[in-house]
Amino acid sequence: MEITIVAVGKIKERYLKEGIAEYLKRLSPYARLAVIEVDDENAPENLSPAEAEKVVKKEGERILAKITPSSFVIALDLKGKNLSSEEFAHFISEKNLYGQSKLTFIIGGSLGLSREVLERADFKLSFGRMTYPHQLMRLILLEQIYRAFKIIRGEPYHK
């Protein structure tokens, strides 16, 4: 299975870089993983709705340019479907079973994802109604993908 994570912005915090590197290493026996970072737009604090939309649209164009046509696209979105870890494992397993071996997860920037990116998504996934920093979300997503593979293989880890 090939999994790509397309994420807006660069990770600056060392502890996040180390956590991400650890899960990428742990995932290597299960899938080929790639993390693609696209530049975030410079956005001052008090943006008007029109300015915010421009920022999200520009980031969205960068995201869409990184998605391969054959990939099944999963956008992380507050309005997406909530899945338990077991349901997420089943979801990944089913995609692989039915020949969808390329998955692309999309993590937007601090202002979210553009309408165009959400329309391109084949599935919208939510990690709950809480808001997380998009940099931290990358680590959380990788941990859940790792957990899913452990569940799929019946290997110890998941409690």
Swiss-Prot record:
Function as written in the Swiss-Prot or TrEMBL entry: Specifically methylates the pseudouridine at position 1915 (m3Psi1915) in 23S rRNA.
Catalytic reactions of this protein: pseudouridine(1915) in 23S rRNA + S-adenosyl-L-methionine = N(3)-methylpseudouridine(1915) in 23S rRNA + S-adenosyl-L-homocysteine + H(+)
Listed CDD domains: RlmH-like
GO cellular component: cytoplasm
Taxonomic path: Bacteria, Bacillati, Bacillota, Clostridia, Thermoanaerobacterales
UniProt xrefs under InterPro entries: Alpha/beta_knot_MTases, RlmH-like, tRNA_m1G_MTases_N
SUPFAM superfamilies, sorted: alpha/beta knot
Cleaved signal peptide residues: none
Organism: Carboxydothermus hydrogenoformans (strain ATCC BAA-161 / DSM 6008 / Z-2901)
A Gene Ontology molecular function term of the record: rRNA (pseudouridine-N3-)-methyltransferase activity
Domain of life of the source: Bacteria
Keyword terms of this UniProt record: Cytoplasm, Methyltransferase, rRNA processing, S-adenosyl-L-methionine, Transferase
KW Methyltransferase (keyword) present: yes
Subcellular location, record wording: Cytoplasm
Protein name in the entry: Ribosomal RNA large subunit methyltransferase H
Subunit structure: Homodimer.
Record has Protease as a keyword: no
Residues the entry annotates as binding S-adenosyl-L-methionine: L76, G108, F127, G128, R129, M130, T131, Y132
EC number of the protein: 2.1.1.177
Family per record: Belongs to the RNA methyltransferase RlmH family.
